[in-house]
Amino acid sequence: AAFFEACGRRMASSAFRKMISVPQLLQSLRFGLVECLWITVGMTSSSDLEQIESRIVSLVKDFAFLHADDSAASSCRPIADMVAKQAVTSSEGGKRLRALLTLDSFRAFASEDVRERDFDALLDLACAVEVFQTGALVHDDIIDDSDLRRGKPSAHRAFSTGTHSEAIGHGLGIMLGDMLATASVDIADKVASKLTHGSDVVAALLNMHREVEIGQVLDLAVELNPLDDPDELVEASLNVFRWKTASYTTIAPLEFGMLAAGIGKDDARKQALAVGLPLGLAFQLADDLLDVVGSSSNTGKPVGGDIREGKRTVLLADAINAANDTQRRELIDMWEADSRSETQVKRAIELFEQTGAIERSRGRIADLWNESKTAIETLSLSEYHESLLIEACSRFVPSIHVQTRA
């Protein structure tokens, strides 16, 4: 149906209201087919999402729940089951951007026969990235002392409620995050033999783990940075984004797709960095911006969460840089306090707006997105596959956050 709709649109155009030659008709049918393929093969987000969701649940259940031959005291099984159920709950929802990018990177670079032969294995690899992310978010929520994740109680909060113990709840949250991180490696390892460059894929996954772990260390270190040097804070924050966010959000998914498509590890890494690094930075800047201009119904988290936590962000640094003396002192005093009231959260957002920090962030996002698109255009892809990859990457940079650059 999509094919005939695509052809119909072309035949309804002015060119088709005139007599055309057979070659011209065939060319238009070919373009109609390309449009159809875009709808049904390249950008099948809804179909991909259904497969990703069901497969993640299956993979997580298989790993997290005790098996029949697992020995565990009957008195302890309820807690083990609680953790396994939470593993599934924590894995539900989300945009699945990383998995979708893994699939579309593979589609953009793989030959048709490889796409058909290896898709199921690649689907599991894409799910492995999402499972890892869930584990990282569980740990992140403990570090940030967050109450909510995707509109539901964060894992450690759910455990604390279920066990009536905050200490045990935090401990179980740490173990759940570890379990999901291990599950991601297990999933990738099981499909490696079915993928081109499978051993390189597993090595890239382990490197991704390492980079995120280093990124979390650096993220905590940034919180000790003084606020009187906003330029240094910007540099340090962007460096954290590279390690903690871009590494597994954009760089690794692109790299996995390229490796599985048959590209050698050195070229895959170089190309994934060229496209994925600016894209990942833009994504995190957009996420930070959403924290102050979004809504809790969209994010699943309260607006101004970073402000409440007193996080040192690029937005904050840009605001301090552009503020007058009074505004600068007000911002620094807020962030140096032990906590911030709801009135102060609203005031901080006002100052971000008044100092131009929000527009500065939109400008950064636009520049980084243009850098990523330019890198894609150098990859010698066909017009169709280049468009596919650009569209896949555009999911990470919602248009609301990108201002037009002259």
Please place each PLM-identified region on the residue numbering.
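All-alpha helical catalytic cores of prenyl diphosphate-utilizing isoprenoid enzymes
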Residues: 69-76, 90-98, 174-182, 189-293
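Divalent-cation-assisted or electrostatically stabilized phosphate/pyrophosphate-binding catalytic cores
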Residues: 149-177, 229-246, 296-322, 336-337, ...
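Conserved N-terminal diphosphate/IPP-binding helix and adjacent helical/loop segment
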Residues: 29, 33-129, 134, 138, ...
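Aromatic (phenylalanine/tyrosine) cluster motif
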Residues: 3-4, 16, 31
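Detector for the Zn2+-coordinating histidines of canonical Cys2His2
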Residues: 6, 24
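C-terminal charged capping/lid subdomain of soluble metabolic enzymes
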Residues: 347-406
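Hydrophobic, low-acid, alpha-helix-prone terminal segments
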Residues: 12-13
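Active-site alpha-helical segments that house and flank conserved acidic catalytic motifs
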Residues: 122-147, 206-213, 255-258, 267-297, ...
